[in-house]
Curated annotation (Swiss-Prot):
Cofactor needs: pyridoxal 5'-phosphate
Modified residues (N6-(pyridoxal phosphate)lysine): 279
GO function terms (MF aspect): glutamate-1-semialdehyde 2,1-aminomutase activity; pyridoxal phosphate binding; transaminase activity
Lineage, highest ranks first: Bacteria, Bacillati, Actinomycetota, Actinomycetes, Micromonosporales
Protein name as it appears in the record: Glutamate-1-semialdehyde 2,1-aminomutase
Species per Swiss-Prot/TrEMBL record: Salinispora arenicola (strain CNS-205)
Family label: Belongs to the class-III pyridoxal-phosphate-dependent aminotransferase family. HemL subfamily.
Subunit structure: Homodimer.
EC nos: 5.4.3.8
Location of the protein in the cell: Cytoplasm
Keywords: Cytoplasm, Isomerase, Porphyrin biosynthesis, Pyridoxal phosphate
One GO process term, biological-process aspect: protoporphyrinogen IX biosynthetic process
């Protein structure tokens, strides 16, 4: 790797020859050149940066450039990159073997940590958030004997067929209503409603209540950009579901263990039936989980009739990284995340206001987004009013100044506890030029 180039606005050339060469090679080998669509930079243009190293708040690309990381691997890296305790835990676990296909002490310890921190009484470990939500829905259907599921437009629950209808995240990024390959039969039992609209939920149950197995919602929406639930929206979802014999599934894959020790539940104490987790609980490795009340979880095989399995579920390396991360994530760390997110958001908002750029700063705990719009953002429709060209210009100016943002206007920004004064100074120095670029790009 070449020496790190100096940080600061305008000091990074737009060209990234090593990343460009890697991307060209990747496109010949991997569809679109990436293994998850948003990484391709299609929403913002240009060449995706191929990262070779992370340390604390910093990412280093193949061209030797250093960036303050405000993506944090899409949420998991609350401690920052290569935290010494996590690295040591991984070294120790790997020395004992990387996978056994049998129960391990580590998965028991990780399950105990999750149960201790959250309202779930039992938890099943899996390898991805998609697996977690897919399995939770199967379990809800098995418990209720019903087929239909309510989800909300702009909420993303992984890429299983039934949940891609009007999804956020990559689907929002690419402007797709759903996905080819999803059959009418697979999507036919999914009812899609506007987010934050409790009257629409009441109407759906009035029309089809006896067929509805569950409502699934993000604890706080983070995949159409960050949109917090209004008032007591989540609690009212629980009340409506329970009054009609249905279950409430709260998707905390993104918020879980990021916004508080107990995830979003630590902020609103919503009485759901099932919860899904991921991202932070793996400490940067592939791990996820779903859990809930013991009588519901008892319906899972081998204890019950609802089948779910996974070859690498409870992988010892993922459990070691996740358990170490969670044990380091105390109340002081969450205060630091909250404070850092507030500072970064204020710096960005002040710069955009000074440049005359219409915007809305939207928080859910320490997750946040900037919507380039005059409109109040409360759901997917209002999120889509933003000026994407303004975000593109803003993104590239920040990238060239050494700040790595999510390469989509419809994603959350994430901070880590490793962000220090040096990193904040680099962000602050980058923002005026980026705000000016957004002003020039607005309406373009």
């Amino acid at each position: 790797m070449t020496d790190v180039l100096p940080a600061g606005p305008g000091r990074y050339p737009a060209a990234a020859p090593a990343s460009e060469a890697l991307f060209a090679r990747a496109r010949a080998l991997v569809p679109g050149g990436v293994n998850s669509p948003v990484r391709a930079f299609r929403a913002v243009g240009g060449t995706p940066r191929f990262m070779v190293r992370g340390e604390g708040p910093w990412l280093y690309d193949a061209d030797g450039r250093r960036y303050v990381d405000l993506v944090c691997s899409w949420g998991p890296m609350i401690l920052g990159h290569a935290h010494p305790a996590v690295v040591e835990a991984l070294h120790s676990a790997a020395a004992l073997g990387t996978s056994f296909g049998a129960p391990t002490p580590g998965e028991v310890e990780l399950a105990a940590e999750i149960v201790d921190r959250t309202p779930v009484e039992q938890v099943r470990l899996v390898s991805s958030g998609t697996e977690a939500t897919m399995s939770a829905i199967r379990l809800a259907r098995g418990c209720t004997g019903r087929a239909r599921i309510i989800k909300f437009a702009g909420c993303y629950h992984g890429h299983s067929d039934a949940l891609l209808a009007a999804a956020g995240s990559g689907v929002a990024t690419f402007g797709l209503p759903d996905s080819p390959g999803v059959t009418d039969a697979a999507a036919g039992d999914t009812i899609v409603l506007p987010y934050n609209d409790i009257q629409a939920v009441e109407a759906a149950f009035a029309a089809e209540g006896p067929q509805i197995a569950a409502i699934i919602t993000e604890a706080a929406a983070g995949n159409m950009g960050v949109v917090a639930p209004r008032d007591d929206f989540n609690q009212r979802l629980a009340a409506i579901a329970h009054a009609n014999g249905a279950l409430l599934i709260v998707d905390e894959v993104m918020t879980g263990f990021r916004v508080s020790r107990a995830g979003w539940h630590g902020l609103d104490a919503c009485p759901a039936d099932l919860w899904t987790y991921g991202k932070v609980m793996g400490g940067g490795l592939p791990a996820a989980a779903f859990g809930g009340r013991a009588e519901i979880m008892a319906q899972l095989a081998p204890a019950g009739p609802v089948y779910q399995a996974g070859t690498l579920s409870g992988n010892p390396l993922a459990c070691a990284a996740g358990l170490t991360t969670l044990r380091l994530a105390d109340d002081a760390l969450y205060r630091r995340l909250d404070d850092t997110a507030a500072v970064v958001g204020r710096l960005a908002g002040d710069a955009l206001a000074a440049a005359g750029v219409p915007h809305r700063l939207s928080y859910a705990g320490n997750m946040f987004s900037i919507f380039f719009t005059d409109a109040d953002v409360v759901d997917y429709a209002s999120a889509r009013t933003q000026q994407v060209p303004a975000f593109k210009a803003f993104f590239h100016a920040m990238l060239e100044a050494g700040v790595y943002l999510p390469p989509s206007a419809f994603e959350s920004w994430f901070v880590s506890a490793a962000i220090d004064d040096t990193a904040l100074e680099q962000i602050a120095a980058a923002l005026p030029a980026a705000a000016a670029a957004a002003a020039a790009g607005h309406g373009g």
